[in-house]
From Swiss-Prot:
Gene Ontology MF annotations: DNA binding; metal ion binding
Cofactor requirements of the protein: Ca(2+)
Protein name: CRISPR-associated protein Csn2
Residue positions binding Ca(2+) 1: D118, D122, G123, E128
Positions annotated to bind Ca(2+) 4: A132, E138, D142, E150
GO annotation (BP), single: defense response to virus
Annotated Ca(2+) 2 binding sites: D118, E138, D142, E150
Family note: Belongs to the CRISPR-associated Csn2 protein family.
Keyword annotations: Antiviral defense, Calcium, DNA-binding, Metal-binding
Gene3D superfamilies assigned to the protein according to its UniProt record, in alphabetical order: 3.40.50.11940
Cysteine-cysteine disulfides: none
Length: 219
């Protein structure tokens, strides 16, 4: 994956864990705004090696780490879709589930007939069953570091998301924690961009200084 915007002379390649530090506050804020407004048409360009642009739905952006809900409706919808696809590979199991949900719908239908009001039901589809069962991601994070790892794990399993961007995440992590996150990202072979306003210590990174000169160095 590659990123380009007006302050860069050439695109930056995002491969596994990539760090980009922008020292000028206004430029940093402008890029954050472009990321949030990304539609594939503004000055921010995200694309792969074949020059194919990243779709807005393929971008996963996190600023408020502790406040980020890994069990958001959008995330659960993707997970339910993956589970349904998994069931499609097991026709016997899916058939059994459909028979059981059909029986449940039939029993409830009998009760609706006996109710004083005219009631109807639409039946149960598989994804609605997942929701009714309360299927969600188990969350055990107590620290910002654990939450970063948790979010990265979620990104790993969301097949429709191709790029995760953390904004100012390293501000809250120790050098050792950053190293563990980098190792986890590498192990899972996902692309993650860490956009920072301060230099990340002891880490190779792209640094855009106050004079808009881009360098790649270890701070």
């Amino acid at each position: 994956m590659r990123v380009n915007f007006s302050l860069l002379e050439e695109p930056i390649e995002i491969e596994k864990a990539t760090f980009l530090t922008i020292k000028d506050v206004q430029s940093f804020a402008h890029l954050v705004k472009l990321i949030y407004q990304y539609d594939g048409e503004n000055e921010l360009k995200l694309f792969d090696a074949q020059q194919k642009g990243l779709k807005p739905t393929e971008l996963f952006v996190v600023t408020d780490i502790l406040g980020y809900d890994v069990n958001s409706a959008a995330t659960l919808k993707l997970i339910y879709g993956d589970l349904e696809a998994q069931l499609n590979d097991k026709p016997e199991v899916k058939s059994m589930i459909e028979k059981l949900t059909g029986t449940i719908s039939q029993l409830i239908g009998y009760e609706l007939l006996e109710h004083e009001m005219d009631l109807e039901e639409d039946g149960i589809i598989v994804q609605e069953l997942f929701k009714a069962l309360g299927i969600k991601i188990e969350t055990t994070s107590d620290t910002i570091f654990e939450k970063v790892m948790e979010i990265t794990q979620v990104h790993r399993y969301l097949s429709k998301k191709k790029l995760l961007i953390f904004i100012n995440a390293c501000t809250y992590l120790t050098e050792d924690e950053v190293q563990q996150v980098v190792e986890y990202i590498s192990l899972n072979n996902v692309d993650v961009l860490f956009l920072e306003q301060r230099v990340v210590q002891n880490r190779f990174q792209y640094i855009l200084d106050e004079n808009f000169y881009l360098s790649y160095e270890k701070a």
